[in-house]
């Protein structure tokens, strides 16, 4: 039998290449999606990106604050996860949770797995930036709102074996409170006893909502781990995290190349996959 093969034309080759490229992209997407699902199953409230999504819910944040502050009269009116505060004159910050209650009090809640990330001067810095960003030009100092910076830490940062530490300025000579309404709190997640706070810290370590003590938190965790819409939301969050990490790596590469001083802005932009304007801005910032 004589079998004749039609010679492959240019268009046929291009179509074949496109199909192959599409298949590779689909396989890569499926691999990343499966990795995301596996990672999502292991998330706990002690993971800041997951915690930020869970506590974007006002009722969950109210519940959290009521236990930490031992108050039942607190009502949250706004809450934002992964909230950026810009500082044009210095270092900007991204807050895990920023909430405001009905009385105008401001709450910054941070999850810190590493001791370095929970150092005391970071708490001070967060507090100062919050003060600077909630005031308007010309506003009277007495109108400055009461603020709380709360660190929930994986380790006992204060090394005293206590479940919670309250830090407020005092007058050294009299021992009386200074009364500036600026509060810093460290919560030691290592203590998971039968107190309300201990049960809350137990829930922060759970990967399975069935193991959690508090229904309000378990339902929110279950939504992001098991509900189709919740899972899709978390997958988008993880994709954004990958993109942000990749961009940070490109910026770091550009900064290293600028430091070497051997390439033009255009060459650095092409190598680091940034715009020429972005490279120039990085250089000007480095000089400043």
Per-segment meaning from a language model:
Residues 2-41, 45, 49, 68, ...:
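Short, charged alpha-helical interaction segments and adjacent helix-coil junctions
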């Amino acid at each position: 039998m004589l079998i004749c093969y039609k010679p492959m034309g240019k268009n046929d080759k291009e179509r074949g290449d496109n199909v192959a490229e599409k298949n590779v992209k689909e396989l890569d997407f499926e691999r990343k999606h499966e990795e995301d699902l596996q990672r999502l199953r292991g998330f706990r409230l002690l993971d800041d990106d997951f915690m930020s999504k869970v506590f974007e819910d006002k009722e969950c944040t109210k519940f959290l604050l009521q236990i930490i502050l031992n108050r039942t009269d607190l009502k949250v009116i706004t809450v934002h996860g992964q909230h950026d505060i810009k500082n044009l004159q210095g270092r900007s910050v991204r807050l895990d949770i920023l909430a405001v209650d009905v009385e105008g009090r401001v709450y910054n809640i941070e999850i810190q797995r590493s001791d370095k990330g929970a150092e005391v001067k970071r708490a001070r810095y967060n507090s100062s930036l919050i003060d600077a960003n909630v005031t308007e030009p010309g506003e009277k100092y007495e109108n400055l709102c009461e603020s709380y910076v709360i660190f929930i830490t994986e380790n006992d940062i204060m090394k005293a074996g206590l479940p919670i530490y309250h830090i407020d300025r005092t007058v050294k000579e009299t021992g009386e409170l200074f009364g500036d309404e600026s509060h810093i709190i460290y919560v030691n997640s290592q203590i998971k006893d039968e107190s309300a706070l201990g049960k809350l810290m137990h829930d922060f370590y759970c990967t399975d909502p069935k193991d959690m003590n508090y229904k309000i938190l378990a339902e929110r965790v279950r939504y992001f781990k098991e509900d189709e819409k919740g899972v899709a939301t978390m997958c988008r969050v993880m994709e954004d995290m990958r993109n942000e990490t990749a961009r940070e790596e490109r910026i770091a590469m550009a900064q290293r190349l600028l430091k070497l001083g051997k390439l033009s802005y255009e060459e650095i932009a092409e190598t680091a996959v940034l715009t020429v304007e972005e490279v120039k801005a990085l250089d000007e910032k480095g000089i400043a």
